[in-house]
């Protein structure tokens, strides 16, 4: 996971988008701070920020909720909409985890 997160230093928006996607699919809580950093970086490509939001939703760690709520009103519509979807997904994923732990 750390090797992927370190690759976020790439200047390629396409590579960074794919890294965010893979981190979301891995559903590793250790990726959350790296994805939050990508989402919060207003200089980051919109495509990367969008995928970081979706990945945070897929991971389902409630630590990301505040950031997702903050950027649900982002001026970039695709980022705002991705955050809204991610909030719903995060709620669903985290509720499923609770069901399985009971």
In which residue ranges do the predicted regions lie?
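Amphipathic alpha-helical scaffolding segments comprising HEAT/armadillo-like alpha-solenoid repeats
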Residues: 1-9, 28-40, 61-73, 94-102
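Short inter-helical turns and helix N-cap capping residues of alpha-solenoid HEAT/ARM repeat scaffolds
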Residues: 11-12, 43-45, 75-76
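Preference for long, well-ordered alpha-helical segments
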Residues: 63-89
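Helix-adjacent hinge/juxtasegments
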Residues: 11-29
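Short, glycine/charged-rich beta-strand-loop motifs at protein surfaces that mediate ligand recognition
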Residues: 41-42, 53-57
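Core register positions within helices of long alpha-helical scaffolds
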Residues: 22-25, 55-58, 86-89, 93
């Amino acid at each position: 996971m750390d090797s992927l997160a370190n690759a976020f230093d790439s200047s390629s928006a396409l590579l960074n988008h794919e890294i965010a996607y893979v981190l979301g699919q891995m559903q590793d809580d250790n990726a959350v701070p790296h994805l939050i950093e990508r989402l919060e970086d207003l200089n980051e490509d919109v495509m990367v920020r969008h995928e970081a939001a979706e990945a945070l939703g897929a991971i389902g760690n409630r630590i990301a909720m505040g950031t997702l709520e903050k950027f649900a009103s982002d001026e970039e519509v695709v980022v705002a909409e991705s955050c809204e979807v991610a909030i719903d997904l995060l709620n669903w994923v985290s509720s499923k985890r609770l069901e399985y732990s009971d």
